[in-house]
């Protein structure tokens, strides 16, 4: 059983002849790819293929299609162009990291916003063939400032788990203080979201409050558990009908692994999350009371029965048909297991959670 993804603006794109159209679909091969169809003849041929994902279709003309994909790594994306005959696929961007694209009509020109974990945003103007025309913003002053302060950088790693006899590598990162000493013992904050099809472990530039903790001597760790995005339909839809169960298992297993590292103070592990991440941090401190000493839960879902149906029923099915999928992951039923310290935060004007 699998849930059906949301339909977005780039799911179906018609060409000017009003007969051919490009469909972004993941159910044919298990990975999100582009396919050419005809109103008259139906399916024609694939435009892209492989064990990687097209993240978005940026624009299309009668002879070319431009798209973003994570072909090089689930942690990164790049901008590509391919002919509408499925031939001549070519990568237009060069930097390894995360690219966002703002195209002109017909992709005659485009603006690229690029960053990675060690490089702040760079904004450049290109023609539709990828040729650099102008650098609009290089953030030179910020880069110079960071170079002089030993700014901590994400270290990416994978955490292996074996589920139902299958080995799965989960993407993670750790941020250490600039003066990290492996002979010392550090407290750890796990930060995560963990929601369906989401990704937090990405090679992109970001500065947040967790970085202030790193400067105060904390380690910050993040993982994308089973059910998150960028790795194909099978991986993403493992959590169908059981939101919160597999993700909690993975997060607790990672925390137990990190607790055993020689430079970690196992008595000072905490977890943070907001919205779905808040739901997860509650589950983790209740079901992983032996490893977490603290949790921060902001705007959490505490029962899927009371969250909006347009989101919940798509991923979890109907409550009448799947009562266990609604109740077993609910932290309300495990509240008596709380041992550590819990900071619960919620806005009084929140019209969502």
Predicted feature locations:
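Multi-bladed beta-propeller domains
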Residues: 1-11, 25-26, 37-61, 70-72, ...
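Short glycine/serine/proline-enriched coil/turn segments at secondary-structure junctions
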Residues: 3-5, 28-29, 72-74, 117, ...
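Blade-terminus and WD-like Trp-Asp/Gly-His loop motifs, strongest in beta-propeller folds
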Residues: 12-20, 58-63, 101-109, 117
């Amino acid at each position: 059983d699998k849930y059906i993804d949301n339909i977005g603006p780039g799911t179906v794109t018609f060409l000017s002849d009003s007969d051919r159209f490009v469909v972004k679909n993941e159910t044919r091969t298990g990975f999100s790819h582009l396919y050419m169809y005809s109103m008259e003849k139906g399916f024609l041929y694939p435009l892209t293929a492989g064990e990687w994902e097209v993240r978005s279709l940026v624009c299309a003309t009668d002879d070319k299609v431009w798209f973003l994909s994570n072909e090089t790594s689930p942690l990164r994306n790049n901008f590509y162009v391919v002919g509408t005959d499925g031939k001549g696929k070519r990568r237009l961007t060069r930097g390894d990291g995360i690219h966002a694209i703002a195209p002109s009509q017909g992709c005659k020109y485009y603006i690229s916003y690029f960053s990675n974990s060690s490089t702040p945003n760079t904004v450049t103007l290109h023609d539709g063939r990828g040729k650099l025309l102008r650098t609009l913003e290089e953030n030179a002053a910020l880069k110079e400032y960071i170079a002089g302060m030993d700014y901590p950088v994400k270290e990416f790693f994978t955490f292996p788990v074996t589920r139902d006899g299958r080995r799965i590598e989960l993407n993670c990162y750790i941020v250490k203080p600039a003066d990290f000493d492996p002979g010392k013992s550090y407290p750890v904050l796990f930060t995560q979201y963990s929601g369906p099809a989401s990704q937090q472990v990405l090679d992109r530039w970001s500065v947040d409050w967790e970085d202030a903790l790193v400067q105060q001597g904390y380690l910050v760790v993040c993982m994308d558990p089973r059910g998150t995005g960028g790795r194909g339909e099978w991986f993403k839809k493992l959590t169908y009908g059981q939101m919160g169960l597999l993700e909690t298992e993975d997060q607790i297993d990672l925390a137990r692994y990190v607790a055993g590292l020689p430079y970690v103070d196992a008595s000072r592990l905490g977890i943070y999350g907001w919205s779905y991440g808040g739901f997860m941090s509650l589950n983790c401190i209740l079901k992983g009371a032996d490893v977490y000493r603290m949790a921060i839960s902001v705007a959490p879902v505490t029962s899927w029965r009371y969250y909006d149906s347009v989101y919940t029923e798509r991923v979890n099915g109907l409550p009448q048909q799947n009562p266990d999928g609604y109740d077993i992951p609910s932290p309300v039923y495990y509240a008596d297991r709380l041992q550590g310290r819990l900071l619960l935060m919620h806005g009084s004007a929140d019209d969502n959670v």
